[in-house]
């Protein structure tokens, strides 16, 4: 279930490009395509569906698995990549910008394969397996979870004695949080912001909400681009670390007055709400680099809107008067 199979050629080009820059995955592909380590196993892969993860899905298929792929976030699914995967024989349930209802339907349809193994990103698949599809748990060998948010959800289940099957916390691996979270998120976040806004970051004030590994990367790259960086952080130790790294640290209510760019990287809900919007500069840019689109309260922002447009929400506040 994809947007349009005619998009496959574009997706294949993207996958072909990343294959040239993923030597470790190429080595694994060569090794496991020969010994068919996953032969006969059903595998559901729920990930940010783009070229790199699509190549991972192809490698798993080449290793013998019957692979079913869904997107872990409707906004990150690339329809041409989904089409390329489907054209290569991978079962895909994913479309860009699908509704919440469609998203849940895709997860459920993927689980109809009755997986032996799962790969999750964010915890929605695991959550469904502990709820409406818990009948599938008996067959499940286990799986892995990629991201910080998903690992937090796993640990909550485990701490309450409710985790029903073994899961590998990939996010706790050194190579994940030291490199992907910090350097990958830092670079890709600013790449997205600058491509979207076409604005210079140098000389601007950037507010980074959260100083975990992803937040560290976002703040580091903002500093490298010439920004004045403010960090908001509820953990006092991480807050001190941000100070030692050369950043100003303050509560969001205070930081909201100064920011030109805001990047939320906490994994928490309602990091920026109407009380913060009310004191922001006119023209402030808000962005979220966390897994779920819940860190900036869009409903509050829409309530303040006086002139909606495709590109932005304009509203009046005391700060703008």
Q: Where do the PLM segments sit?
A:
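Conserved small/polar residues in nucleotide/adenosyl-binding loops
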Residues: 1-4, 315-320
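Glycine/serine-rich phosphate-binding loop and adjoining beta1-alpha1 elements at the start
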Residues: 2-38, 72-76, 82-204
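Gly/Ser/Thr-rich loops at beta-strand to alpha-helix junctions
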Residues: 47-53, 73-77, 123-125, 213-214
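Glycine-rich phosphate/diphosphate-binding loop of Rossmann-like nucleotide-binding domains
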Residues: 50, 187, 194-256, 264
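Histidine-anchored nucleotide/phosphate-binding helix
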Residues: 50-63
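Short internal beta-strands
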Residues: 66-75, 230-232
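ADP-ribose/adenylate-binding Rossmann-like module
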Residues: 137-148, 278-314
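Rossmann-like NAD(P)-binding element
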Residues: 250-295
């Amino acid at each position: 279930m994809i947007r349009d199979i005619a998009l496959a050629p574009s997706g294949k080009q993207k996958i072909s490009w990343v294959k040239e820059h993923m030597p470790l995955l190429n080595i694994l592909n060569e090794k496991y395509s020969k010994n068919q380590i996953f032969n006969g196993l059903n595998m559901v892969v729920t990930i940010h569906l783009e070229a790199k993860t699509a190549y991972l899905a192809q490698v798993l298929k080449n290793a013998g698995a019957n692979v079913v792929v869904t997107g872990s976030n409707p906004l990150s699914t690339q329809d041409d990549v989904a089409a390329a995967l489907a054209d290569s024989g991978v079962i895909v349930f994913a479309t860009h910008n699908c509704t919440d209802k469609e998203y849940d339907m895709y997860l459920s349809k993927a689980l109809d394969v009755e997986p032996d193994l799962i790969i999750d990103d964010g915890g929605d698949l695991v959550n469904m397996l502990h709820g409406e599809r818990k009948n599938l748990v008996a067959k499940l060998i286990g799986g892995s979870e990629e991201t910080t948010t998903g690992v937090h959800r796993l640990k909550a289940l485990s701490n309450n004695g409710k985790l029903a099957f073994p899961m590998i916390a990939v996010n706790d691996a050194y190579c994940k949080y030291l490199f992907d979270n910090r350097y990958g998120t830092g670079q890709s976040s600013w790449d997205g912001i600058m491509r979207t806004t076409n604005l210079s970051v140098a000389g601007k004030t950037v507010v980074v909400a959260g100083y975990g590994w992803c937040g560290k990367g976002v703040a580091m790259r903002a500093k490298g681009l010439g920004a004045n960086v403010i960090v908001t952080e509820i953990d006092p130790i991480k807050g001190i670390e941000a100070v030692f790294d050369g950043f100003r640290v303050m509560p969001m209510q205070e930081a909201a007055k100064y920011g030109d760019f805001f990047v939320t990287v906490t994994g928490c809900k309602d990091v920026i709400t109407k009380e913060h919007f009310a004191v922001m500069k006119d023209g402030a840019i808000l962005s979220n680099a966390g897994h779920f689109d819940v860190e900036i309260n869009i409903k509050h922002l829409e309530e303040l809107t006086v002139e909606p447009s495709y590109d932005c929400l304009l509203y009046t506040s005391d700060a703008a008067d």
